[in-house]
């Protein structure tokens, strides 16, 4: 069965609608199926509204989704219909104090928002079983969206002048709510812009090594291409396929599998 067929199957069992999100979830599912036992437990860190946790639950995984946001967990619980998926409001310190270890840990689109990503990774190292796998996904800090959308937007926001107010008004008029399909957090600002080299360095400093790198999309979520891709779904699929043909530096996001460094 080819990747396109697998993505179509995945689309039928997830709340994600965007092709790159479905591709990201498929990477996570495949990586976990290859590395953890059938009755293993997966920790979803920074789970937000729980969309990934529920996607994993639909695949039969036992999932424990955690977030520091009461609002996020309340929504995650409200939307959850899977008996094998549960959610709690827990911070890193509580996770360590709990002392439990997990067969797999998912940290998807989280590290770029943290002041100190290495602090969380140290906690995840303690929370992962010796032969477990950590799945990390982050935007490519030098990818099209970060270069042409995220960084200019942050620079404009810092100026906080009439141009920023006009920009916010335009986004609002176009239906942009300032949230993502994965999170309704009040602040989704990117504090870090990871390159592949930076991510590998961060992994090493946290006593992990990256055993697999993958790509997400190219420009389907970059204005003005996003206007067309949002309405014409096949453009999203083509964009994800194009990302596979281009050098990894051109991808919009990195998907990766980490394991504990045995050296």
Predicted region positions:
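Active-site hotspot residues in diverse enzymes, especially metal/ion-binding acidic/histidine motifs
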Residues: 1-7
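S-adenosyl-L-methionine-dependent methyltransferase catalytic module, highlighting the catalytic core
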Residues: 8, 12-22, 51, 68, ...
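Conserved SAM-binding loop
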Residues: 25-148, 254-260
């Amino acid at each position: 069965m080819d990747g396109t067929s697998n993505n179509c199957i995945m689309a039928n069992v997830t709340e994600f609608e965007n092709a790159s999100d479905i591709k990201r979830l498929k990477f996570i599912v495949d990586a976990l199926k290859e590395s953890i036992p059938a009755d293993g437990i997966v920790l979803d860190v920074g789970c937000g509204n729980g969309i990934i946790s529920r996607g994993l639950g639909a695949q039969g995984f036992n999932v424990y989704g955690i977030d520091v946001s009461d609002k996020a967990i309340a929504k995650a619980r409200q939307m959850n219909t899977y008996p094998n998926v549960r959610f709690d409001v827990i911070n890193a310190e509580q996770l360590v104090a709990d002392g439990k270890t997990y067969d797999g840990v998912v940290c998807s689109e989280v590290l770029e928002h943290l002041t100190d990503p290495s602090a969380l990774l140290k906690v995840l190292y303690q929370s992962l079983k010796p032969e477990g796998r950590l799945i990390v996904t982050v935007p490519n800090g030098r990818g099209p969206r970060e270069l042409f959308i995220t960084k200019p937007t942050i620079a404009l926001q810092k100026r906080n002048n009439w141009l920023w107010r006009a920009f916010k008004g335009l986004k609002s008029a176009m239906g942009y709510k300032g949230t993502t399909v994965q999170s309704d957090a009040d602040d989704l600002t990117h504090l870090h812009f990871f390159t592949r080299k930076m991510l590998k360095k961060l992994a090493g400093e946290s006593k992990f090594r990256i055993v697999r790198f993958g790509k997400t999309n190219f420009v389907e979520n970059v204005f003005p291409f996003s206007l067309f891709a949002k309405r014409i779904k096949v453009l999203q699929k083509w964009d994800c396929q194009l990302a596979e043909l281009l050098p990894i530096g051109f991808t919009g996001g990195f998907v990766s599998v980490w394991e504990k460094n045995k050296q």
